[in-house]
Swiss-Prot record:
SMART domains: ACTIN. SUPFAM superfamilies: Actin-like ATPase domain. The gene is ARP7. It comes from Arabidopsis thaliana (Mouse-ear cress). InterPro entries: Actin, ATPase_NBD. This is Actin-related protein 7. Induction: Before cytokinesis. Keywords: Acetylation, Chromatin regulator, Cytoplasm, Developmental protein, Nucleus. GO terms for cellular component: cytosol; nucleus. It comes from the Eukaryota. It is found in: Nucleus; Cytoplasm. The lineage of its organism: Eukaryota, Viridiplantae, Streptophyta, Embryophyta, Tracheophyta.
Length: 363
């Protein structure tokens, strides 16, 4: 039985058997709805009324609701991927940057005590995203739904002192898009779900800052929503991508994403600058935005540093849109090594040491 690989993000959970040259078998929303008794039933009125409660098990990349996470994983491994209770196999999880030790321990405890897995392994997303493009050293720029992580990696080890997380991601870009659309379409009543879909369809990156300024006169497109409302979309589509290069658009006093990358790498020993900068990997759903990659490389070419960031192209045999699930693909590659070579946490390891064994065997 192939090991399972799970990459649980704030917006989507990616899971499937460890087959590296295929996309994950399951890509499902992480957000869940649970039916809850509203407490209105009584002896006089025995009719029970249920209401939908929306749950987000994962916030900004980290597990926050363990009961919901257990339900989500139960659905994934048993219903979605065909595990049978009493015959569970090995499982590998991707770890976001800055995952607290307590969360790692609680996850390994959940896997062995509730899911009764045969073996467990976890590895950091930055390392796995590099594995997906055939590298063990480089720097990942991961723009997720709830965060941006920039992490230098040397010989398969994340340089945590130099790494940086920004509490900014696709969620904030969606809110920005909603605000911008509201200015030009004041009578519209848009749900965040509508805005998210519009962002995915229309968001674009201008070629450079000068081109962005010229978008004030860009062509206006009309889009008809499912409810019949017609919305006008003009320059707003460019503000989403521009905010990553000019965070002041979001009201933040931060450097743009390329400048952040260069500054982060400059804190690592100078002898490693070249291999980090020349092996830059973009990952996360937002990086698939039209024009983002070319804008990133153009900004990189304008850097004042002696060595400029260069983006790594994924191998041709890898699945399309690799950046959207590169950590999962890297996890599938690693699973082919750690489980056959018995480098993982076994049930015997767990029984002997307890949850803290994860820090000794998974790094």
């Amino acid at each position: 039985m192939e090991a399972l690989v799970v990459d649980a993000g704030s917006k989507f959970l990616k899971a499937g058997a460890a087959i590296p040259d295929q996309s994950p078998a399951m890509i499902i929303p992480s957000q869940m709805k649970r039916m809850v008794d509203d407490g209105s039933s009584s002896a006089d009125n025995p009719t029970t009324v249920f209401e939908d409660v929306t749950l987000d098990p994962i916030e900004r990349g980290l597990i926050r609701d363990w009961d919901a996470m257990e339900d989500l994983l139960r659905y994934v491994v048993y219903t979605g991927l065909g595990w049978e209770e009493g015959n569970e196999g090995n499982i590998l999880f991707t770890d976001p940057l800055c995952t607290p030790k307590a969360i790692r321990e609680q996850l390994v405890q959940l896997m062995f005590e509730t899911f009764n897995v045969s073996g467990f392994y976890a590895s950091e997303q930055a390392v796995l995203s590099l594995y997906a493009v055939g590298r063990i050293s480089g720097c990942t720029v991961d723009i997720g739904h709830g965060k941006i992580d920039i992490a230098p990696v040397l010989e398969g080890a994340v340089q945590h002192i130099a790494s940086k997380r920004f509490e900014l991601g696709g969620t904030e870009l969606t809110k920005l898009f909603a605000q911008e659309l509201g200015k030009t379409n004041p009578s519209m009543n848009l749900s965040m779900s509508d805005v998210e879909k519009l962002k995915e369809q229309y968001a674009n990156c201008a070629e450079d800052e000068i081109a962005y300024k010229k978008t004030q006169n860009c062509e206006i497109e009309q889009h008809t929503l499912p409810d019949g409302q017609v919305i006008s979309i003009g320059r707003e589509r460019y503000s989403v991508g521009e905010a990553l290069f000019q965070p002041s658009i979001l009201g933040l006093e931060e450097h743009g994403i390329v400048e952040q990358l260069v500054r982060i790498i400059s804190t690592v020993s100078s002898e490693n600058h070249r291999q980090l900068l020349e092996n830059t990997v973009l990952c996360g759903g937002t990086t698939s935005m039209t024009g983002f990659e070319s804008r990133f490389q153009k900004e990189a070419n304008l850097c004042s540093s002696a060595i400029r960031p260069t983006l790594v192209k994924p191998p041709e045999y890898m699945p399309e849109n690799l950046g959207m699930y590169s950590a999962w693909v890297g996890g599938a590659i690693l699973a082919k090594v750690v489980f056959p070579q018995n480098q993982h946490v076994t049930k015997a390891d767990y029984d002997e040491t307890g949850p803290s064994v994860v820090h000794r065997k998974c790094f």
